[in-house]
């Protein structure tokens, strides 16, 4: 089956044919590092991590770029709040955080969140502040082509002229006259209120460290310009996929596409957007107190459970969070892990005789090829787990082995094997744990053989108190670790 993805620009699912044979180029918007990561950030990262993994599984060499917006009005505002009345004081007298330090601190928080949930590092992760010359070049190209102009009030701002580009609004299928004015700068100096800032002139009271010299005066780049300059530097003027959250379609992605194409770049062949996360059907909002952060989720469940939950819905659909969501995800992960452990103890986990592609069920491949239909793919995964358990119960070790290898292949491509999982038996520490538990089970088996039921029950109870669940079967006892 041909890979097919939904393209926001054409509003249809269409065949994905890489621009370069055997390769795929993907850019998705990273964070504006002004605060702690929220659940929407990590859901988006997991969605595009699933996309990357699937493209790689299908034999493509994937180049991924995820930017870091480390200079922005919101970052400066957050830093200014920390300065309070001491903004103009000598640095030694301030109990504050400079904007660049604040941005870097939150950037590390995002990196930690991504890593804890098994999101692969991108090929390139450029910071906006490291690409100012490329932004200047792009602005000049737009001015030269008649699509941008310095502000009429000598403020040092440079704006994109939306009416100069006839395709403006095409990504989100809007008419210019129906749009509201751009909120990113004072409307003075604009030809049209909808024109958006490419360059923001330095203003009195702003930190001098947050300005760069330019042909139009000292200042800093506009948010939309940053992404266009960075993506074309690393992926070129035309690339396969541009992604991000649904909330970025307008104005951010609309403006990105307009300024890039107006500058002469073909830009993205596909636009892919992931859905939002809601709380019991309502939009998450700090003001009404119905938000949940990745850190809070990780206090309630293991990283693998959180990744399973955030990645279980179709990437384009809304993911609704409820107080029981993580419990339900934990039960699903436990079913998978329980089978993997039981089957591994019977047939081993050595390298399979065939490739991961051969182990992957055809129905799973068809689901993932069809616009990353992860819910359908997970259905195949759980059906394989059920079939594997049935094979184990009937003593069909070859059937159990085939199911095990299929399950391992599916969890790998979904990224569920790469998440830190302290409950899994892996590594030297867990190997030692396994030896100790198996020794206890051998002692219990000996007690049962001698009909010493009290000793047998005592060993079982001791293991249970340590979080080890023992199950007796026709072929002996198996064990697994209890999940919270």
UniProtKB/Swiss-Prot annotation:
GO MF, one example: zinc ion binding
CDD domains (alphabetical): CysRS_core
Uppermost EC category: ligase
GO cellular component: cytosol
Pfam families: CysS_C, DALR_2, tRNA-synt_1e
GO biological process terms held by the UniProt record: cysteinyl-tRNA aminoacylation
InterPro entries found in the cross-reference section: Cys-tRNA-ligase, Cys-tRNA-synt_Ia_DALR, Cys-tRNA/MSH_ligase, CysS_C, Rossmann-like_a/b/a_fold, tRNA-synt_1_cat_dom, tRNAsynth_Ia_anticodon-bd
Residue positions binding Zn(2+): 29, 227, 252, 256
HAMAP family assigned to the protein according to its UniProt record, in alphabetical order: Cys_tRNA_synth
Protein name as annotated: Cysteine--tRNA ligase
Lineage: Bacteria, Bacillati, Actinomycetota, Actinomycetes, Micrococcales
Gene: cysS
């Amino acid at each position: 089956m041909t890979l097919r993805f939904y393209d926001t620009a054409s509003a249809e699912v269409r065949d994905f044919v890489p621009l370069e044979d055997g390769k795929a180029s993907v850019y998705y918007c990273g964070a504006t590092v002004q605060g702690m990561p929220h659940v929407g950030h990590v859901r988006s990262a997991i969605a595009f991590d699933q996309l990357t993994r699937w493209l790689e599984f299908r034999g493509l060499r994937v180049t991924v770029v995820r930017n870091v917006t480390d200079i922005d009005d919101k970052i400066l505002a957050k830093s200014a709040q920390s300065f309070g009345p001491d903004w103009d004081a000598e640095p030694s007298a301030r109990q504050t955080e400079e904007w660049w330090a604040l941005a870097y601190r939150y950037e590390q928080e995002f990196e930690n969140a991504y890593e804890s949930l098994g999101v692969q590092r991108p090929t390139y992760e450029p910071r906006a502040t490291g690409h100012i010359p490329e932004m200047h070049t792009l602005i000049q190209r737009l001015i030269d082509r008649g699509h941008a102009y310095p502000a009429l009030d000598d403020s040092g701002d440079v704006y994109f002229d939306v009416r100069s580009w006839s395709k403006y609004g095409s990504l989100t299928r809007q008419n210019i006259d129906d749009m509201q004015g751009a909120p990113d700068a004072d409307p003075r100096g604009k030809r049209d209120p909808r024109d958006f800032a490419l360059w923001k002139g330095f203003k009195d009271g702003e930190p001098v460290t947050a300005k760069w010299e330019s042909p139009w005066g000292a200042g800093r780049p506009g948010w939309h310009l940053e992404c266009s300059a960075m993506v074309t530097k690393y992926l070129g003027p035309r690339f396969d996929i541009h992604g991000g959250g649904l909330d970025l379609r307008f104005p951010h992605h609309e403006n990105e596409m307009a300024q890039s194409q107006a500058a002469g770049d073909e830009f993205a062949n596909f636009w892919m957007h992931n859905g939002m996360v809601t709380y019991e059907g309502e939009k998450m909002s700090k003001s009404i107190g119905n938000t949940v952060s990745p850190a809070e989720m990780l206090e309630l469940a293991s990283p693998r459970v959180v990744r399973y939950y955030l990645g279980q819905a179709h990437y384009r659909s809304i993911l609704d969070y409820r107080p029981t969501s993580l419990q339900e995800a934990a039960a699903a992960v436990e079913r998978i892990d329980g089978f993997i452990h039981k089957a591994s103890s019977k047939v081993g986990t050595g390298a399979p005789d065939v490739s991961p592609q051969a182990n992957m069920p055809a129905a799973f491949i068809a689901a993932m090829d069809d616009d990353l239909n992860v819910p359908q793919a997970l259905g195949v995964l759980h059906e394989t787990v059920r079939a594997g358990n049935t094979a184990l119960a009937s003593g069909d070790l070859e059937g159990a082995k085939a199911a095990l290898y299929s399950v391992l292949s599916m969890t790998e491509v979904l990224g569920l094997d790469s998440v830190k999982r302290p409950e899994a038996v892996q590594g030297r520490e867990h190997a030692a744990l396994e030896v100790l538990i198996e020794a206890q089970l051998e002692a219990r088996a000996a007690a049962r053989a001698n009909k010493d039921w009290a000793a047998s029950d005592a060993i079982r109870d001791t293991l249970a108190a340590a979080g080890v669940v023992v199950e007796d079967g026709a072929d002996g006892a198996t064990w697994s670790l209890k999940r919270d």
